[in-house]
Design a protein with these regions (language model features):
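Short metal-coordination and nucleic-acid-contact micro-motifs, chiefly zinc-binding Cys/His arrays
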Residues: 190-196
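Short, solvent-exposed secondary-structure capping/transition elements
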Residues: 207-211, 268-269
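Conserved phosphate-interacting/catalytic interface
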Residues: 1-190, 235-587
């Protein structure tokens, strides 16, 4: 299903003229042009790099160009057509293995002769003449190359270019005769390949022995990783070797890898969260869908020129099945949409999740998630929404050296949000541990508690307790949380400027075993009330009386279960935020 969806995406892009036909890589980073004269002499080394924005600064980066399809290299010698590194195009490098460099150059010359012999094109003749006359030993000291030799050997890719006697010049990759010759060679390259019925297209075709590499996954090998590979006998069946174990045609292998590489290279379609790289796309290949989806669950709308209010309005409309105009495009809630999560695993890629639904259904799941997370927030917290990464960070000790949340948690949380399924128990466990360790109920932690219990245990009692702001529920754990917050306030008012409050010493015991903590705290509060002025004493005594009246006659509970502790923490958070809100209004 994954490969079929990616292949269909490639074919849609091909119809729209956004990708090259099979046999060509649409985007490849090229740094320099080797410009040749009609007789094959090297006329110039042209720098193709360009300035691109990176964060708040500008950097020099290679230019992305369409080039002939790249071979997948292992440890052997394998040349690429028209575009390669100095080892192949010039026969020299700084790796200290001159014999291997010469072998690379010879392989390059052999490939170009195989493709271009007999081609009636000045550019083709110039390239062959260059390869026949070039002396690799002269490359490092060549007057046109010496100054840039260090840069040329810094993982730079070069491409052949040509110049006519009248001064006109062009890249060899754009020469019609050369493109035709290469296309013919590529189309017949699998003539000797094993044939079988392709699992993706359903057609009898030559099977790809090794699939092209996937690049751009954070944490994977720089040379690329494989989504489909068989590199040990234990992975093979019925005597098949490598790609024959999962027959995918050369065309389909090219199509799905091209599509995935394009998605990974586009920041509007790709986002990394933890060790998971997420790519998403619409069936019609309109980029606005991917752009909007990443804003919905990863944030960053302001950086893309979209206000939080406009984003929220678009999400709400789509969740209700209404089309909206967004980023100069119309988003249809019925459009098929795909989300793929992948993680690095040595030379392979692991699929964390693959989701397919209508764009409107994804929007509804995200809207429901946002509604469950909604909770009153401190005045200093300006965030309209909490991203997936922000939620995962609430489970991590921010003072530790490694502040990365569990990759498994991030993946499970993403799946739950996008499918509308139950939140992972590890999310609740992580938040509970942080609250116990730090005795702090932040906005993010309170929002997680609220969302978790409303989604995983949608009882009437939970709907009554886990609300956006303070409510008058008589639920005992919730009332106890409110009571603890009031007791803390009484202590702070009676002893202004104290460094530690009852929260630092009693929060965990009050939350888990109220009967052991609250009698002491209530007695302590009476002493604090005596220190106050009469208006404050009356005000807080009234609050204490109202809350104590809602507790059972049997007294404080001996212990609270985990869900009840969640209600306690929400009650504490609600009451505390009401206190701060009132203080801000007075100021």
């Amino acid at each position: 299903m994954i490969l079929q969806a990616l292949t269909a995406y490639y074919e849609q892009l091909l119809k729209q003229g956004k990708v090259e036909a099979p046999g060509w890589d649409s985007r490849f980073k090229v740094s320099y042009e080797l410009r040749l004269g009609p007789d094959g002499q090297l006329l110039a080394l042209n720098d193709l790099r360009q300035e691109v924005p990176k964060g708040k600064k500008t950097v020099i980066a290679p230019r992305e160009l369409p080039v002939p399809h790249r071979v997948k290299r292992a440890s052997g010698v394998a040349a690429n057509f028209l575009c390669d590194n100095t080892s192949y195009l010039l026969g020299a490098d700084e790796k200290g293995k001159p014999e291997r460099s010469r072998q690379c150059f010879e392989a390059c010359a052999a490939l170009h002769h195989k493709v271009l012999d007999g081609v009636d094109s000045p550019a083709a003749k110039a390239i062959l003449a260059f390869l026949d006359s070039w002396e690799p030993d002269t490359a490092p000291t060549h007057p046109l190359l010496a100054e840039q030799w260090a840069d040329l050997n810094n993982n730079a890719n070069l491409v052949f270019g040509c110049e006519s006697p009248d001064g006109a010049h062009w890249l060899a990759t754009t020469d019609d005769a050369i493109r035709t010759a290469w296309q013919s060679a590529f189309d017949t390259s699998d003539a000797d390949a094993e044939t079988a019925r392709c699992l993706i297209t359903g057609k009898e075709a030559g099977i790809a022995r090794i699939h092209p590499a996937i690049k751009g996954v954070m944490g994977a090998q720089a040379a690329g990783a494989a989504l489909v590979s068989f590199n040990a006998p234990a992975f093979c069946s019925y005597g098949h070797e490598q790609g024959a174990n999962a027959p995918v045609s050369e065309y389909a292998a090219f199509a799905y890898t091209t599509a995935l590489n394009l998605l990974l290279a586009d920041r509007n379609c790709c986002q990394r969260i933890g060790d998971t790289t997420i790519v998403c796309w619409a069936e019609n290949a309109a980029p606005a869908y991917s752009n909007a989806m990443l804003m919905f669950f990863c944030g960053g709308a302001e950086a893309r020129g979209v206000s939080e209010s406009d984003l929220a309005a678009a999400l709400k409309a789509l969740s209700q099945g209404r089309p909206v105009s967004f980023l100069d495009d119309k988003l249809d809630p019925n459009q098929n949409f795909y989300v793929l999560g992948i993680s690095p695993n040595a030379a392979r890629l692991s699929v964390r999740f693959f989701l397919h639904s209508s764009f409107g259904q994804f929007a509804k799941n995200l809207q429901d998630h946002a509604d469950r997370l909604e909770i009153t927030r401190p005045a200093f917290d300006k965030r309209e929404n909490l991203s997936v990464w922000a939620l995962a960070q609430e489970t991590v000790n921010q003072k530790s050296r490694d502040k990365s949340p569990s990759p498994q948690l991030v993946g499970d949380l993403l799946r739950a949000i996008l499918t509308g399924g139950p939140y992972p128990a590890t999310l609740l466990n992580g938040v509970t541990l942080r609250i116990r360790a730090e005795r702090e109920v932040t906005r993010g932690r309170a929002a997680i508690l609220k969302a978790y219990y409303l989604r995983n245990y949608p009882t009437e009692l939970n709907k009554e307790v886990f609300t956006v702001s303070l409510n008058e529920s008589s639920n005992v754990p919730y009332v106890l949380g409110r009571l603890f917050s009031v007791l803390e306030t009484i202590q702070s008012v009676a002893n202004p400027g104290i460094n530690a409050t009852i929260k630092d010493r009693y929060f965990n015991s009050a939350c888990a075993t109220p009967a052991t903590a609250f009698p002491t705290l209530v007695k302590l509060a009476q002493k604090h009330l005596q220190k106050m002025t009469t208006p404050n004493e009356v005000h807080f005594s009234k609050q204490l009386t109202e809350l104590m009246a809602q507790l059972p006659e049997t007294g404080f509970p001996a212990r609270l279960s985990l869900p009840e502790q969640g209600a306690f923490e929400i009650g504490y958070y609600h009451q505390t935020q009401k206190r701060y809100a009132k203080k801000n209004e007075e100021e």
